[in-house]
A protein has these predicted regions:
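Short terminal hydrophobic/aromatic SLiMs and anchors at protein ends
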Residues: 5-7, 25, 29
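Extreme N-terminal starter segment of soluble prokaryotic enzymes
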Residues: 33-36
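Glycine-rich, positively charged N-terminal anion/phosphate-binding segment
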Residues: 43-112
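A structural motif
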Residues: 58-60, 118, 160
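Non-cysteine beta-strand/loop elements that form the S-adenosyl-L-methionine
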Residues: 65, 119-128
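Alpha-helix-loop-beta-strand connector modules within alpha/beta enzyme cores
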Residues: 85-91, 142-161
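Glycine-rich tight-turn/loop motif centered on a GG-T
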Residues: 130-147
């Protein structure tokens, strides 16, 4: 059995080389429980991986999708639909990861995901890819604090999740 290499990141998370994240909980770190969260890795951790992993090993507590990008046309791409289709994720907890800068589009997608049965979304503010940041998405939104504040004000006021 291969043991993954653990790299502490200093923020309460520990990343493993296979995309896993451990998150610690507990008052004053006295009694800690561990959650196994599967981080998204493009081309690796899609719906087929999640089902194969669940059938072969104990399932992770949550699996995060590759980012979904809400757009003004208010549709899901075929890839996005495949990732979030409840039938493709039976028996596991999946957390859709959203990336964007328009609160109205985010709220539309969050509403659609709530209607599909999801109870949580993850908002990506960390992607450093230039093709993402030039669109004011991912880490690119961090360079626009006023836009980010307006985004969060609107989302926190109306998000169904």
């Amino acid at each position: 059995m291969r043991v993954p290499f653990i790299i502490p990141d200093g923020g309460g998370f520990v990343k493993l080389d296979a995309g896993w994240i451990f998150r610690y909980h507990g008052p004053d770190d006295e009694v800690m429980t561990m959650q196994y969260l599967c981080a998204p890795m493009e081309g690796v951790t899609g719906d087929l991986f999640r089902q194969a992993q669940r059938q072969t090993f104990p399932a992770a507590d949550s699996y995060y999708t590759l980012f979904l990008s809400p757009t003004a046309n208010r549709t899901f791409s075929p890839r996005e639909l495949r990732e979030i289709e409840p039938a493709h994720n039976a028996g596991i907890r999946v957390v859709p990861q959203l990336m964007g800068h328009c609160a109205e589009d985010f709220l539309w997608m969050a509403g659609q995901l709530a209607d599909m049965g999801y109870d949580e979304v993850n908002f990506n503010l960390g992607c450093p890819s230039n093709t993402v940041t030039v669109k004011k998405k991912g880490a690119g939104l961090l360079t626009e604090p006023d836009l980010l504040r307006r985004f969060f004000d609107a989302v926190f006021a109306a998000c169904p999740l």
